[in-house]
Amino acid sequence: MCRIAGAPRTLLPLLAALLQASVEASGEIALCKTGFPEDVYSAVLPKDVHEGQPLLNVKFSNCNRKRKVQYESSEPADFKVDEDGTVYAVRSFPLTAEQAKFLIYAQDKETQEKWQVAVNLSREPTLTEEPMKEPHEIEEIVFPRQLAKHSGALQRQKRDWVIPPINLPENSRGPFPQELVRIRSDRDKNLSLRYSVTGPGADQPPTGIFIINPISGQLSVTKPLDRELIARFHLRAHAVDINGNQVENPIDIVINVIDMNDNRPEFLHQVWNGSVPEGSKPGTYVMTVTAIDADDPNALNGMLRYRILSQAPSTPSPNMFTINNETGDIITVAAGLDREKVQQYTLIIQATDMEGNPTYGLSNTATAVITVTDVNDNPPEFTAMTFYGEVPENRVDVIVANLTVTDKDQPHTPAWNAAYRISGGDPTGRFAILTDPNSNDGLVTVVKPIDFETNRMFVLTVAAENQVPLAKGIQHPPQSTATVSVTVIDVNENPYFAPNPKIIRQEEGLHAGTMLTTLTAQDPDRYMQQNIRYTKLSDPANWLKIDPVNGQITTIAVLDRESPNVKNNIYNATFLASDNGIPPMSGTGTLQIYLLDINDNAPQVLPQEAETCETPEPNSINITALDYDIDPNAGPFAFDLPLSPVTIKRNWTINRLNGDFAQLNLKIKFLEAGIYEVPIIITDSGNPPKSNISILRVKVCQCDSNGDCTDVDRIVGAGLGTGAIIAILLCIIILLILVLMFVVWMKRRDKERQAKQLLIDPEDDVRDNILKYDEEGGGEEDQDYDLSQLQQPDTVEPDAIKPVGIRRLDERPIHAEPQYPVRSAAPHPGDIGDFINEGLKAADNDPTAPPYDSLLVFDYEGSGSTAGSLSSLNSSSSGGDQDYDYLNDWGPRFKKLADMYGGGDD
């Protein structure tokens, strides 16, 4: 049929509202589903529709739930929906022969969930109208009429239609291309037009899904659609003439892909894990499982429902859990969850679309694993009512007893972990109970020393609890309390001194043999008959001794407060007390002697060395006194000069500045520079006072205008100490030893040079009597000889006719030899290097000395040797028959040869 895009609603005739709702009864009880029970509502109306006229009624099922649903029409300008689902006409308009299509939306006000249903309104046919077109006829979409000029004025066109969308189901089986609508312009009667469509699905990706016949305007789809990929296509239709000029304004064409139930629900996880505490009441939330469906969630195809297919194990009830069919929330519906009996439940969950319709809906399953978590519903119970243990006295951190308990709760959880406490029998807190994290046992431990002589046994009352309180309604049984009997074992303890340290006050200077005090040690083992012996452990100055039996301490030397072993007037000595127990034990005690000072040290001058100028002005010497005693046996001091020698008071004068300082000055106008020893009498304030003549070494020197000595040497340089003298002597001795070693080394070096040979042994050295022999050639260059001269010895010329160039190099030249300077005498054997260098220089300057860079010709000795080889040259007699004594006459060069053959029997 024809859909006029530009036709106004006022042209639709009003027909009586006739609702045709057909629901096929299948004989089965359908499951309740929320939403519209029908996919499409249709009504046949009269030609004229009046404002406020009820047209039809749409039903909405909320499955007995009090949903507040609000209705809305896709064409609010023409239709409205009342709260009860009645559809009214907003205005009056004639209903045309074509169908009027629109959508009705229902939305939950609370959850914002939305449903929709299609409504088709058709006009009741009349006798004068053409019969209805066949169903296979294609719907047309006509371009709206344009504004046109008429009699020089513009005419307004009537309000255009908003073209309803085209609904096209997904997964259509064709055949393809499948015709949808025909797009046409009213101007095709006068012009030759060309039609085209643009937009995604046509000329934009994905391209080629929709095509249009450019001449007829037939719009077709070329392949099945998938709503899950693209749910809506928005195309634009164009009409141009054959020259490409736009004839009509483009119109929008919306193609909705209608969802089909082609996707099964998919769970987000195949295995869901949840937990619930044991003993939970019915209605306790456990977990939520969720599945999704790729189909339209606002249609039945995407509306899921959940249910539990099975539960394992089925104890104590086969229906311990239930699931909300819409949300997937799993809750408990029965009591009796006990982890000690069933620790885990496995549920098979099914999700079905089509609102759970088992006939038409698609389903999928997942597994829900529910773990029953432990609660503290089982208190710990001791395995015995009384536990026993023992501990040696004075021992700490010792495990006395091991307490064992049983707990049926899950191990290593707060409901199983035991916490022990001592409820009685330990008022002073000498014991503590630790928990073994692995075995959950209680370890009774001693944390404070126990004295056998005070407590021989303890009876403790202990209680066992958990780290978390017991579940509501659970009480601790009597087995959660036990008794621990601890026996204390007597051991040999250390003797001890009281008080320790012991402090006494004594004057220094006590003579040896003076009894100071008695140290007495006590043995805490009252029930053991033991003897104590005393020994000295520490006595830094070795002043004391102790009686081994009674502990009496006596001096063996004079006590001196000024000793370096006395710190802050206190002398410390340590003594040891040992018993004869098994094993023997010992204890230490300290004696502190506070030494009172006596005036036993005379004062000394300080400093002991000073310097002054030769004249009284401009400086003087400030002195003080050093006294190792303390007040009142020290200062104030009195300073004076002795009467003898008389030069002291003649040259010097001393003035007391205060009780601790005095000033020494020159009394005469000039004193020659030098070192002077000035005796000074110093008296302290002790009772009786103690005096001392102390020597002050004064260096008198020449001074500059500032009163400073111009001498470089200090007073210490006036004399050498013993150490300096020893150092100087050692340096002198070391220097002498080095010189002596150098002389010995030089002499030995000279001897080695005399004994060293140049080319031969020292005994063969004949440089004092040089012998000259004929030389047969030079160095390497004379080895390059002519083999032909050796192979043809007959061609050798006589000496008289030999050319000069081929004479033997070892022959003396015939002409007069040039005179060369006579070589100097051989140098001393110690300077072998100089001797070799001089000989080399002389040989280089001698033109007659071989070798020459020339051919060497040797004398011809005849041919035809009777000896075929060197081995054939054998003496007619043995070596013993020959006399080699003549070798001794050949000189030192043949001495070795003479020794070899003339050595007699050797």
From Swiss-Prot:
Does DNA repair appear among the keywords?
no
Low complexity bias locations: 863-880
The Cadherin domain extends over 160-267, 268-382, 383-497, 498-603, 604-717
Q: Which UniProt keywords apply?
A: Calcium, Cell adhesion, Cell junction, Cell membrane, Cleavage on pair of basic residues, Glycoprotein, Membrane, Metal-binding, Phosphoprotein, Repeat, Signal, Transmembrane, Transmembrane helix
BP GO annotations: blood vessel morphogenesis; brain morphogenesis; calcium-dependent cell-cell adhesion via plasma membrane cell adhesion molecules; cell adhesion; cell migration; cell-cell adhesion; cell-cell adhesion mediated by cadherin; cell-cell junction assembly
What post-translational events are described? Cleaved by MMP24. Ectodomain cleavage leads to the generation of a soluble 90 kDa N-terminal soluble fragment and a 45 kDa membrane-bound C-terminal fragment 1 (CTF1), which is further cleaved by gamma-secretase into a 35 kDa. Cleavage in neural stem cells by MMP24 affects CDH2-mediated anchorage of neural stem cells to ependymocytes in the adult subependymal zone, leading to modulate neural stem cell quiescence.
Residues given in the record as Ca(2+) 3 binding sites: N261, N263, D293, N301, D353
Binding sites annotated in the UniProt record for Ca(2+) 1: E170, D226, E228, D262
Traits of the deletion mutant: Embryonic lethality.
Q: What is its main location?
A: membrane
**Effect ascribed to mutating A237M:** Loss of calcium-dependent cell-cell adhesion
Query: Which Gene Ontology cellular component annotation is one that this UniProt entry carries?
Result: sarcolemma
Protein location:
Cell membrane; Cell membrane, Sarcolemma; Cell junction; Cell junction, Adherens junction
Signal in keyword set: yes
The GO terms describing molecular function are: alpha-catenin binding; beta-catenin binding; calcium ion binding; enzyme binding; gamma-catenin binding; identical protein binding; protein kinase binding; protein phosphatase binding
**Which N-terminal residues, if any, form the signal peptide?**
1-25
Coiled coil (residue ranges): none
Q: Which residues form the propeptide?
A: 26-159
| Membrane-topology annotation of the record | Single-pass type I membrane protein
Recorded superkingdom: Eukaryota
Cytoplasmic side of the membrane: what ranges?
A: 746-906
Q: What tissues express this gene product?
A: Expressed in cardiac muscle (at protein level).
Which residues hold Ca(2+) 2? E170, E228, D259, M260, D262, D295
| Function as written in the Swiss-Prot or TrEMBL entry | Calcium-dependent cell adhesion protein; preferentially mediates homotypic cell-cell adhesion by dimerization with a CDH2 chain from another cell. Cadherins may thus contribute to the sorting of heterogeneous cell types. Acts as a regulator of neural stem cells quiescence by mediating anchorage of neural stem cells to ependymocytes in the adult subependymal zone: upon cleavage by MMP24, CDH2-mediated anchorage is affected, leading to modulate neural stem cell quiescence.
Subunit structure of this chain's protein: Homodimer (via extracellular region). Can also form heterodimers with other cadherins (via extracellular region). Dimerization occurs in trans, i.e. with a cadherin chain from another cell. Interacts with CDCP1. Interacts with PCDH8; this complex may also include TAOK2. The interaction with PCDH8 may lead to internalization through TAOK2/p38 MAPK pathway. Identified in a complex containing FGFR4, NCAM1, CDH2, PLCG1, FRS2, SRC, SHC1, GAP43 and CTTN. May interact with OBSCN (via protein kinase domain 2). Interacts with FBXO45.
Q: What is this protein called?
A: Cadherin-2
Q: Which gene encodes it?
A: Cdh2
